[in-house]
Every structure is written in structure tokens, then in C-alpha cells.
């Protein structure tokens, strides 16, 4: 009965995707309505697959895969593969800025040190944060809302037999490890999350702000920092980092009642380094839109049990099917709902699946394949900030 109701509702209120969707394809990927995908491509150490589905009126997720030289000096090392997933909130400006600048900063610092390292990654995050702060300062007088725009920022770097994973916010990187004796796959989460729905993150916020009993507030059954935002770390969200951007003309809902004594949110990434092993088969990098619907283990089993080609798109579809199931509606009906309204049913979802070939990893120093650079989303962006 509820499914019939949604049929009626979608036909009356939301135009069918068959009349409003557009489909195109090129070497960078394919677009089908609100879904963009690159089913299969090669990176330095194997294959990869990408998919993005839009729910917000403006796509707030951005993503990229870069493979080849990881420095600005193309003739020298290190060589590797870089994956970035940037889940924006409050608007698309910060995630787009990160997509345009973070990888370039990483290459610059890697060139200075002639290597990849935790320090290189941290400096790249810091430079990106400082760059966006400059954008906010420049636009504050005419566009104060930009101070309340931010982005989660998850990256992975495969280089010299190591995997570096860095994160701010609540996107997630999960490794699929195969158990040789059984052929089964286990999920190993490599990223730390910074969402105050997690008790340890709330405890961290209380320890950093012992004089503020309202640093984390339960509002409408959801934990939020200062009753406003769920993540405790991000790029951007300058209104919760710099007091000069937490005042008029910023909207009242973003302004704090009491003076800001110190930055409330942090840009500092949690960084892990994993020595890659032969049983490390693939990596899933995804925004929280995927993980709201699928567990880590469910996701790695889908990848393990299906063909590689189009596997990111398959994960997105599995998440959408679960979102439809939660609303007791059909998947086909969910797909008819237009962007904007769709956000009431699920978030923007970005997925990158990176397969790892042990033989290619062992020969990394001798590989000189063409560079790869693909951005997820297939959306024409306005002029850079």
C-alpha cells in the first residue's frame, strides 16, 4: 500500500526521470540522470571504479583519482596513486576548492621532501585550509555564508608499498583483505571518523573544551557540536574556527551566543600508514552517504562477489536499494525523485573502489605508465574560487 502511495506521490509532485534525465558519456565517465560513473579504468597498481549519485540540489560531493608522478617534478619520484573524496556541507564551494587544490599542494610538498610522508600530507591539508580561509576573507563582505560552508576530506595515497590514509570528517576508507584458506574477505577500516555521534569523539571534544558544558548538544535526537554541526573536524567551516567570521552579517543560526575562546572545529587530519600485504585486495573510499546504508563488511562482500567492472556503481545501487527499503518504497520509485527532494531520502553518495595488483605493487619503481586524472561527478563547475 505504501509503495502505491509513493507511486502516486512521485507522479504528481516530482517529474519522472525519464522526462528530465540526461545521458552522456566520454573518456572521463558517463552521466545518467543524477548518476555519474566510470565503470573501469587503470591506475598504476591495478584497476579502479568510480560512481557518484546526486541528492542535493547542488552536488556537494567531489572526488578524484590521480595516478603517476606524485610530485611537481614529473621526471622524478615518487610515483603512486592518489584518491580523494570530499563530502561538502552547507554548499559545494569548499569541496570544489579542495578538489582543485589539495593534490597540487601534496605534490609540491612531496617534491620538497623528495618522498611521500605523513608530514607531506599534513602540510597539504594545512595549506588547503589556509587557502580556503583566504577565500572566505576575500568574499566575506559580499557572501558571508561562505564562512559556514565546509567539507569532509578523505584521501588515500598508495606509494612505495605503503598506503597512507588521511581524514577529517566522517567519510571512510575500508580495506578488503582476503583470507586465503577460505577465499572470504574481511573488512578493515583504515580511517578515523570525526562525528560526534561517536562517543569517543564527544569525549575528545569535552577534553578540548572543558570550560564549555554545551560543546556537544543532543538536538532532535542527533548529537551536534554547539547544536549546529555533526563533524568535529573539517576543511572550511571557518565560522567555528575564527571569531571574526562568527558575527553579523552571518545568519543568526550559525552565530554563537558566547565569545569564541578557541577554534571549535579542527582541520587536523587523522593519518594512518599501512604496509600493504599480498592479501590486501582492494580499497573502498566513500562519503558517509554510502556508509549510512551499508556496513563495512556488506560493502567488501559486494566487491568480492561481483565483477570488477562497474563495481562502484553496484555499491551505489545497493545503498539506494537500502535507502528505498527503509522508506518502504521501491527502488524504481526512488530513482524518479529529483535532486533536492531526493536529499530527504539519502545523501550525495561517492564511491571509489581501488584494486591492488601485488605484482604491479612490487614493480612500482620501474613502472612508467601514462598519468591518470579523473574527477568524479561529471558536473560542469563554475569558475574556480
From Swiss-Prot:
Binds 2 magnesium or manganese ions per subunit. GO terms for biological process: positive regulation of cellular response to heat. SUPFAM superfamilies: PP2C-like. The lineage of its organism: Eukaryota, Viridiplantae, Streptophyta, Embryophyta, Tracheophyta. May dephosphorylate and repress plasma membrane H(+)-ATPases (PM H(+)-ATPases, e.g. AHA1 and AHA2), thus influencing negatively plant growth and fitness. Disruption phenotype: Plants missing PP2C42/PP2C-D2, PP2C64/PP2C-D5, PP2C79/PP2C-D7, PP2C63/PP2C-D8 and PP2C68/PP2C-D9 exhibit an increased hypocotyl length, as well as an enhanced sensitivity to LiCl and media acidification. It catalyses: O-phospho-L-seryl-[protein] + H2O = L-seryl-[protein] + phosphate; O-phospho-L-threonyl-[protein] + H2O = L-threonyl-[protein] + phosphate. Mn(2+) 1 binds at residues 87-88. Mn(2+) 2 binds at residues 87, 288, 347. This is Probable protein phosphatase 2C 79. PROSITE patterns: PPM_1 (PS01032), PPM_2 (PS51746). Its EC number is 3.1.3.16. The gene is PP2C79. Its cofactor is Mg(2+); Mn(2+). It comes from Arabidopsis thaliana. One of its GO terms (cellular component) is plasma membrane.
Amino acid at each position: 500500500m505504501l509503495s502505491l502511495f509513493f507511486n502516486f506521490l512521485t507522479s504528481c509532485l516530482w517529474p519522472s526521470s525519464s522526462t528530465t534525465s540526461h545521458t552522456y558519456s566520454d573518456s572521463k565517465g558517463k552521466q545518467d540522470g543524477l548518476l555519474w560513473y566510470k565503470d573501469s579504468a587503470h591506475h598504476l597498481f591495478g584497476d579502479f571504479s568510480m560512481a557518484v549519485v546526486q541528492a542535493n540540489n547542488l552536488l556537494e560531493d567531489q572526488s578524484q583519482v590521480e595516478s603517476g608522478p606524485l610530485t611537481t617534478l614529473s621526471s622524478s619520484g615518487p610515483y603512486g596513486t592518489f584518491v580523494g573524496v570530499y563530502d561538502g556541507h552547507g554548499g559545494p564551494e569548499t569541496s570544489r576548492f579542495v578538489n582543485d587544490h589539495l593534490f597540487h599542494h601534496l605534490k609540491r610538498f612531496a617534491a620538497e621532501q623528495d618522498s611521500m610522508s605523513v608530514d607531506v600530507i599534513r602540510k597539504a591539508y594545512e595549506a588547503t585550509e589556509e587557502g580556503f580561509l583566504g577565500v572566505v576573507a576575500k568574499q566575506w563582505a559580499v557572501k558571508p555564508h561562505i564562512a559556514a560552508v565546509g567539507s569532509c576530506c578523505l584521501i588515500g595515497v598508495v606509494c612505495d608499498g605503503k598506503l597512507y590514509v588521511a581524514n577529517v570528517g566522517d567519510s571512510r576508507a575500508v580495506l578488503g583483505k582476503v583470507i586465503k584458506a577460505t577465499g572470504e574477505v574481511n573488512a578493515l577500516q583504515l580511517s578515523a571518523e570525526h562525528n560526534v555521534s561517536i562517543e569517543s569523539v564527544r569525549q575528545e571534544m569535552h577534553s578540548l573544551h572543558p570550560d564549555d558544558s554545551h560543546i556537544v548538544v543532543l538536538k532532535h535526537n542527533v548529537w551536534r557540536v554547539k547544536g549546529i554541526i555533526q563533524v568535529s573536524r573539517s576543511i572550511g567551516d571557518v565560522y567555528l574556527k575564527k571569531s571574526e567570521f562568527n558575527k553579523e552579517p552571518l545568519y543568526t543560526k550559525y552565530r554563537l551566543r558566547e565569545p569564541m575562546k578557541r577554534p571549535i572545529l579542527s582541520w587536523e587530519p587523522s593519518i594512518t600508514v599501512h604496509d600493504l600485504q599480498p592479501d590486501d585486495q582492494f580499497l573502498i573510499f566513500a562519503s558517509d552517504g554510502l556508509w549510512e546504508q551499508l556496513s563495512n563488511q556488506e560493502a567488501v562482500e559486494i566487491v568480492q562477489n561481483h565483477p570488477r567492472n562497474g563495481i562502484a556503481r553496484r555499491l551505489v545501487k545497493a545503498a539506494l536499494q537500502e535507502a528505498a527499503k527503509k522508506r518502504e518504497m521501491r527502488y524504481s520509485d526512488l530513482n524518479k525523485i529529483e535532486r533536492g527532494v531526493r536529499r530527504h531520502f539519502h545523501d550525495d553518495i561517492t564511491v571509489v573502489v581501488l584494486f591492488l595488483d601485488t605484482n604491479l605493487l612490487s614493480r612500482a619503481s620501474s613502472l612508467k605508465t601514462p598519468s591518470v586524472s579523473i574527477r568524479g561527478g561529471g558536473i560542469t563547475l563554475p569558475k574556480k574560487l
